Amino acid sequence: MRNEYGEKLSRNGYAPSIMQSDLSYCYRCGRTTGKLDFHEVYGGTNRSKSKRYGLWVVLCHDGCHLGTWGVHYNAEVMEQLHREGQIAAMEAYGWTEEEFRKRIGKNYI
């Protein structure tokens, strides 16, 4: 199966990340040891869109993903990822801010 841009989806519905090409380290801190988790940049009703458009990164489990300074417990970190995801999508797919908002539901920049 492929997304509308021709990118092959994994069996779990993930297109290749447009935000991180090397998945061997944490996107935020660069950690290479310990558990690394996939993190969809836009969650909730947009989780499947994050997967389909490659708007996901790898985060270290104990720190940047679920730690007190991690994306799930720090609104500033979450907003930064949202902005970076929007910029990546606009560059990769040629979307305008309006096109992004129509697809994801909110403009983050």
Where are these regions (language model features)?
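Histidine-centered catalytic micro-motifs
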Residues: 36-44, 61-68
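Short linker/helix segments within small regulatory modules
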Residues: 42-56
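Short Cys/His-centered divalent metal-binding micro-motifs
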Residues: 56-81
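A general structural-boundary detector
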Residues: 13, 46-47, 76
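A boundary/linker detector
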Residues: 1-35, 80-109
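Short, functional N-terminal and low-complexity linear motifs
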Residues: 26-30, 53, 70-71
